[in-house]
A protein has these predicted regions:
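N-terminal amphipathic/basic-hydrophobic helices that include classical n-h-c signal peptides
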Residues: 1-37
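Extended, loop-rich substrate-binding clefts of extracytoplasmic carbohydrate-active enzymes
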Residues: 104-156
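Beta-strand-rich N-terminal accessory domains
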Residues: 23, 27-100, 104-107, 250-259
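Short solvent-exposed loop/turn micro-motifs enriched in small/polar/acidic residues
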Residues: 32-35, 89-91, 111-116, 143-147, ...
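Hydrophobic residues positioned within well-ordered beta-strands of beta-sheet architectures
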Residues: 40, 128-130, 148-150, 161, ...
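Active-site/ligand-binding surface loops and adjacent short beta/alpha elements
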Residues: 182-185, 189-259
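Acidic, contiguous internal or C-terminal segments within carbohydrate-active enzymes
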Residues: 134-181, 187-188
Length: 259
């Protein structure tokens, strides 16, 4: 129903100190399809962050002391994105379609917000907000009025990613929203990811489902348990052979890439 939902993700880049004044700017560039794009910059003495207006997508987080990049550089040979926001669907629908109000609608994986130009609404020294509004084209795929707001706030060695979904209509707004950040790993120039892993705060074991690579649909009958050592699971040669690890429920509130 009419109203709004607010969510926040916190990315922390550790072992960084001596933070002072933040400032913001922007520059214009042409993408690989010769499309005119805007990239906005948030910067302090420690981090430099870049966000595209297209998809309001986080594209770069660099440690300024040594120009170390934390984010995946969107090599299209493997995966041509860096950190798309998934809206109004997370994942795939069966046959890439769904029914609502007696009608069938076609929609691609992860919705459409990541593939649309967002409007920069406000910008301060340390914070920037973008917005995306429903229009005639989105209504063809998703028959709901909405306002999606995506914000980024730079504070010390942390980048806060904020979402706000507003419903300007009186009918219930059905949606899902998700993050899809990709981080550089290995981080220090190693030849493999062995020795790196994930830490799930407060957990002794992790329960997850898998999915089918050809459709992306979850295999809900599959319940896999990963034992954790000191809250961690380390990457093995076959760790990423599985398409996706689907972790349901509020098992933890913090996941870290560790080495």
């Amino acid at each position: 129903r009419s109203g709004s939902v607010f969510s926040l993700i916190l990315l922390t880049f550790r072992n960084i100190h001596n933070v002072k004044l933040s400032f913001a700017n922007a520059y214009r560039y042409l993408d690989d399809k010769e499309k005119d794009c805007m990239r906005y910059v948030l910067e302090n003495d420690t981090l430099r962050v870049e966000i595209d207006s297209f998809g309001a997508e986080l594209k770069s987080v660099k440690r300024k002391s040594d120009d170390k990049e934390y984010m995946w550089y969107a090599d299209k040979k493997y995966w041509g994105r860096t950190s798309p926001v998934l809206f109004p669907f997370v994942g795939n629908c069966r046959n890439k379609e769904y029914r609502y109000g007696g009608k069938t609608y076609a929609i691609g994986q992860h919705g459409f917000a990541r593939d649309m130009e967002h409007t920069m609404e406000s910008q301060t020294e340390d914070t920037i907000w973008f917005s995306l509004h429903s229009d005639e084209e989105t209504m063809k795929k998703y028959p709901f009025a909405f306002v999606l707001k995506i914000g980024y706030k730079l504070a010390d060695n942390e980048l806060k990613v904020m979402w706000k979904v507003e419903n300007p209509d009186t009918k219930t707004l059905y949606f899902s929203i998700g993050a899809h950040p990709a981080f550089l790993c290995p981080f220090n120039g190693e030849e493999s990811k062995l020795g790196y892993g994930l830490q799930f705060a407060g957990l002794k074991e992790l329960h997850h489902h898998g999915n089918t690579p050809d459709t992306g649909l979850a295999v809900m009958s599959e319940d896999i348990v990963i034992p954790l050592e000191d809250e961690k699971v380390y990457f093995t040669p076959g760790f990423f052979d599985r398409c996706t690890y689907m972790v349901e429920g509020k098992q933890t509130g913090e996941v870290s890439l560790v080495t």
